[in-house]
Amino acid sequence: MEIGSSSTVAGGGQLSVPPGFRFHPTEEELLYYYLKKKVSYEPIDLDVIREVDLNKLEPWELKEKCRIGSGPQNEWYFFSHKDKKYPTGTRTNRATAAGFWKATGRDKSIHLNSSKKIGLRKTLVFYTGRAPHGQKTEWIMHEYRLDDSENEIQEDGWVVCRVFKKKNHFRGFHQEQEQDHHHHHQYISTNNDHDHHHHIDSNSNNHSPLILHPLDHHHHHHHIGRQIHMPLHEFANTLSHGSMHLPQLFSPDSAAAAAAAAASAQPFVSPINTTDIECSQNLLRLTSNNNYGGDWSFLDKLLTTGNMNQQQQQQVQNHQAKCFGDLSNNDNNDQADHLGNNNGGSSSSPVNQRFPFHYLGNDANLLKFPK
């Protein structure tokens, strides 16, 4: 047994004890020492348990009425004399002004030294309101009564009680479980959404599936929508990507790189004529800075000379048609039809029309095969 530093005895006097001592008796001590002496009217050496009329006090009022010492206290002890609920009955009246105490469970036997039975413990819960309806509270009371074969204990005799407020561990654990369940359900929903979006993106792009991570869920959710529509304009983006890095027009070396880039894009575009690429390279070499100093007027003169040559050839053909008669005219018409079918209806020579470089003293093969 421990006693507080400054305790009030039943007679009203003050008891001086060393600081740090608390009143915390065991169940055996409550029954075999305190209650037995109380019933037998024997003096108690340290009488710190007060007598309380349980029907006139509420459980929250016992905190001040039954305080022992000045230190913190979470259990309150008192003696109570049980009253009959009915004059001719045996039931105990445990009602107060605000509620009532209701017994719960079965009585527990208390043994001395694990052998001799010395008493019983009844557990009661306080309800606010009136029986049988009431609101359950967290106030608990353990009521101890003697059960000795030598003494006949009446139902309306003395009892010693311990009142405390139940620590709501179960409610805190239940709330924690609800929070854990909520977080677990949210995590499952996130994973389900993650799997759903990953499945959509895998179907839209089988060659490069998108892998989602929980932290990047919002970013990839926006990226998935773009990936779904990617096949619709992938062809156009491929062509525009290649055109964004075209070399300069007047660089022969860059023209070769452009030809290689165009050749790599053949699965997406129509086939490119190799002869046209080679002729373009030769044209760039002729018009480069090394040969003509970057003067593009040369190309204008070249095209003008080609047009004049075509007009002269047309005049010669007309003169020959008049001289040689209908036979020559028919032959020229057949030749013109043949040239028109090959060149989209044009009657002029493709070599002279496209590349009239023979006036410069260059061979036509120069335009077909790169140096």
Swiss-Prot record:
Keywords for this protein: Developmental protein, DNA-binding, Nucleus, Transcription, Transcription regulation
Taxonomic superkingdom: Eukaryota
Occurrences of domain NAC (ranges): 17-166
Any GO MF annotation of the entry: DNA-binding transcription factor activity
Biased composition (Basic and acidic residues): 192-201
Induction pattern: By FEZ in oriented-divised root cap stem cells.
Gene Ontology CC: nucleus
Name of the protein in its database record: Protein SOMBRERO
Species per Swiss-Prot/TrEMBL record: Arabidopsis thaliana
Lineage: Eukaryota, Viridiplantae, Streptophyta, Embryophyta, Tracheophyta
